[in-house]
């Protein structure tokens, strides 16, 4: 028996401002830090010893995990992976979602956010929001850095990393991943075998741990959000 815990970072500054964030390295706000503390407390109540910790490269995920580890009093090394980063929103990066609905129409913005293979226009490489211009990503080969992504693109990079680095350890280790709405949606699509319509409806809450239990043959047995009150309207498979 083993466990996988997926945690979307706590609320960020740009989450509150309702902006497309993507690969921009925005930190948690005060509510996000509170959510991360609560996540740590909920995980601690389960008395699960975490063997491996993973995070994206992004500050909001790293700091969420740091707060969780403080609550667990467990400071094992964290493996940071850019492959777990949020989806890159291309030219939408930094823009307010409600303003874009007024400009492009609600249906178009919904398609950009939830369709499987639609990419926004690429982000100009001269933009300060482009990953090539953000110090966080200087260690990543330039040809690996996207300037826009669909959910399908995000799924492919996340699941490739999961298959190569994480899945091999599920059988005998408990693992916690701190990541993002779309990278966790990608993992849920894979682990719950969701189709493209189902994944478009899946909401991932900030700072609410999703606990998955596996048997010794790597079969997913069940899953639950640890903050059940905040998860009462969410789909859990």
Model-identified regions with their sequence ranges:
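Extreme N-terminal starter segment of soluble prokaryotic enzymes
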Residues: 1-5
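Loop-to-helix element that buttresses phosphate recognition and phosphoryl-transfer chemistry
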Residues: 11-69, 79, 142-160, 201
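Acidic, His/Gly-rich catalytic cores of divalent-metal-dependent hydrolytic chemistry
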Residues: 227-237
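Active-site glycine-centered loops adjacent to acidic/histidine catalytic or metal-binding residues
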Residues: 9, 83, 180
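Phosphate-coordination/substrate-recognition cap region in phosphate-metabolizing enzymes
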Residues: 39-130, 137-139, 189-213, 220, ...
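Metal-dependent active-site segment of extracytoplasmic phospho-/sulfohydrolases and closely related
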Residues: 174-176
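GST superfamily/GST-like fold recognition
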Residues: 181-186
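Phosphate/ATP-binding catalytic cores across multiple sugar-kinase/actin-like superfamilies
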Residues: 157-169
């Amino acid at each position: 028996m083993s466990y996988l815990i997926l945690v979307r970072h706590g609320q960020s500054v740009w989450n509150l401002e309702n902006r497309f964030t993507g690969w921009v390295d925005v930190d948690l706000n005060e509510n996000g830090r509170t959510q991360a503390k609560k996540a740590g407390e909920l995980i601690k109540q389960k008395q699960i010893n975490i063997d491996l910790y993973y995070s994206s490269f992004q500050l909001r995920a790293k700091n969420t995990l740091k707060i969780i580890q403080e609550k667990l009093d467990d400071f094992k090394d964290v493996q940071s992976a850019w492959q777990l980063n949020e989806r890159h929103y291309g030219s939408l990066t930094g823009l307010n979602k409600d303003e874009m609905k007024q400009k492009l129409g609600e249906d178009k913005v919904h398609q950009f956010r939830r369709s499987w293979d639609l990419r926004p226009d690429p982000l100009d490489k001269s933009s300060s929001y482009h990953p090539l211009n953000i110090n966080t990503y200087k260690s990543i080969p330039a040809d690996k850095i996207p300037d826009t992504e669909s959910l399908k693109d995000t799924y492919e990079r996340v699941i490739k990393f999961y298959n190569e680095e994480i899945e091999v350890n599920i059988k005998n280790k408990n693992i916690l991943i701190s990541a993002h709405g779309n990278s966790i949606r990608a993992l849920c699509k894979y682990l719950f075998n969701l189709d493209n319509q189902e994944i478009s409806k899946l909401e991932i809450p900030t700072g609410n741990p999703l606990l998955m239990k596996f048997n010794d043959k790597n079969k997913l047995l069940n899953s639950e959000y640890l903050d059940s009150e905040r998860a009462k309207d969410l789909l859990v498979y």
